[in-house]
Amino acid sequence: MTKKSDNVTNNSKSGNGISRRSVMKGAAAAAGAAAGSGALGGFPTIWAQEIKDIELTHVGVSYSVVKAIGDQASKDLGFKVTMQNLDTSAAINRFITQPNSVDIADVEGWQAKLATKRGVLQGIERAKIKEFDNILPIFTKGEIDGVQIPRQGISPYEAMYIEDPMATDLHEGVTDWMTFLPQVYNADSMGYRPDLVGHEVTEWKELIDPKFKGKAAILDVPAIGIMDAALCFESAGMIEYGNKGNMTREEIDKTIDALIQLKRDGHFRATWTTFDQSVQLMAAGEVIIQSMWSPAVAAVRVKEVPCIYAPVNKKNGKEGYRGWCNGMALMRHLEGKKLDAAYEYLNWYLSGWQGGFVARYGYYSPVPTTAQKFLTPAEWAYWYEGAPAPEPISDPYGVPMEPVGAKRDGGSFVERVTNISCWNTLMDEAAYMNKRWNEFKVA
């Protein structure tokens, strides 16, 4: 981060914030259009004949870069969008070492920081983003509902802005140029099998409780897994951290040493790196508590296996969710009509269809007002308001997931987001942390 902004010019709707009341008000009037309602008016705005042969390659992790979303974008925009999935480490490596093989890089804040520093991205011109003024203040002021978003780790607000399109350093505060356009985010915690655990889980320390020896698992993505571990050890009172999102070497050593001891004691049944692995472990009952992503919990439920996403609201200076945000970045090689098409694609993403789609497996849109138009009133009530489902709730593909009366784990959008305690990150000691994490893996 290079400097604070002293000339923020964004005094638009997003500057007013989005209050608990305005976010959570009923959707009956606004939610008339459901998913699959057809092409959106106004797309594309450049001549269809000129863009019909264009193909954009959007690369990133499977929970963010989804084929069904690319297919709908292609249908609505008139040019082809190809989605390619890589895990977190492989994706950032591809962006940096093979930048010309990617058009749209799907990045988290820490990846945007790294890719910007390496000079492989070009800035996104804020004036060309039609819904920018309606983006939530999480991304324009670093706050929501009057509550400042925590700065442990790298919050999206800290990684979003640069001073000019070819800048290689971040700038704190809204400018005319962005490193990435946020498209999906959430608050992560643990998943558990209530039928096998036997009680409600609301604290991270449960993941390392000896009573779950041989039945627990943790995420094996070093930069994220170590933060889940830190939340556990902090919750249990075993380790105190100055900043879980940017640990000292001493804190890294304490954390990894504790993980290695747990592994040697047989505590972890497995570590996992992919969505499917986490679903299989939980659905089969091989593990009964683990680090987990929201759509993975949903996927277990679709199999008619009970699974709960632990509500880890902050208390006594501990607990809280691990926040993350993925967004779309423009690779530096884009120019001409292909760059124009990329802007059409970015604007399509915030126009509502994608926001409605991802809501159905528990993720949030940076512009809920457009996503709401593609959700039924019942879906909005369940996913955003945290209200009991007025009717059965289905996943993005129409598969029944929740019965009437079910409530979302963790409550409303505002309740969940204001209980984030840290964000996915790239630590200053990342190289050392990765070395120590590998020692944990082979222990």
What are these regions (language model features)?
Residues 18-39:
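N-terminal export leaders
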Residues 225, 230, 242-274:
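Glycine-centered hinge/linker elements that transmit conformational signals in sensory
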Residues 1-19, 45:
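N-terminal secretory signal peptides
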Residues 48, 328-408:
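Mature extracytoplasmic/periplasmic domains
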Residues 397-443:
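Conserved C-terminal helix/tail region of periplasmic/extracytoplasmic solute-binding proteins
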Residues 49-118:
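Early extracytoplasmic/lumenal segment of secretory-pathway proteins
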Residues 101-105, 122-189:
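A structural signal for short loop-to-beta-strand junctions that line the ligand-binding cleft
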Residues 267-336, 372-375:
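Extracytoplasmic/periplasmic substrate-binding proteins
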